[in-house]
């Protein structure tokens, strides 16, 4: 079952989510839009096992990284009723 991993612009570039991911789905990429000069990216979502460790590791008040599991993916993106 595929999962979607969404990185929001509230990412502070702390790398906590990247270090928490057991399957290396996430990586940091350069980005001028935050103080750290980098932001999380999810180039390998096909490897996501849905453990949500990245969400648990995120220190921001609004989770900067969210994992949407299976059918939750289409619902959250407005593709299903």
Swiss-Prot record:
The keyword Cell division does not apply. Apoprotein for the two 4Fe-4S centers FA and FB of photosystem I (PSI); essential for photochemical activity. FB is the terminal electron acceptor of PSI, donating electrons to ferredoxin. The C-terminus interacts with PsaA/B/D and helps assemble the protein into the PSI complex. Required for binding of PsaD and PsaE to PSI. PSI is a plastocyanin/cytochrome c6-ferredoxin oxidoreductase, converting photonic excitation into a charge separation, which transfers an electron from the donor P700 chlorophyll pair to the spectroscopically characterized acceptors A0, A1, FX, FA and FB in turn. Residues 2-31, 39-68 form the 4Fe-4S ferredoxin-type domain. [4Fe-4S] cluster 1 binds at residues 11, 14, 17, 58. It is found in: Plastid, Chloroplast thylakoid membrane. The eukaryotic PSI reaction center is composed of at least 11 subunits. The keyword Metal-binding applies. It comes from Ostreococcus tauri. This is Photosystem I iron-sulfur center. InterPro entries: 4Fe4S_Fe-S-bd, 4Fe4S_Fe_S_CS, PSI_iron-sulfur_center, PSI_PsaC. PROSITE patterns: 4FE4S_FER_1, 4FE4S_FER_2. GO terms for biological process: photosynthetic electron transport in photosystem I. GO terms for cellular component: chloroplast thylakoid membrane; photosystem I. One of its GO terms (molecular function) is metal ion binding. Its EC number is 1.97.1.12. Keywords: 4Fe-4S, Chloroplast, Electron transport, Iron, Iron-sulfur, Membrane, Metal-binding, Oxidoreductase, Photosynthesis, Photosystem I, Plastid, Repeat, Thylakoid, Transport.
């Amino acid at each position: 079952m595929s999962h979607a991993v969404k990185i929001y612009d509230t990412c502070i570039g702390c790398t906590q989510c990247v270090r928490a991911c057991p399957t290396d789905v996430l990586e940091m990429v350069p980005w001028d839009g935050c103080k750290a000069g980098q932001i999380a990216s999810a180039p390998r979502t096909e490897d996501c096992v849905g453990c949500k460790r990245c969400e648990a590791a995120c220190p921001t008040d609004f989770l900067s990284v969210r994992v949407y599991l299976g059918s939750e993916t289409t619902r959250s993106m407005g593709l299903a009723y």
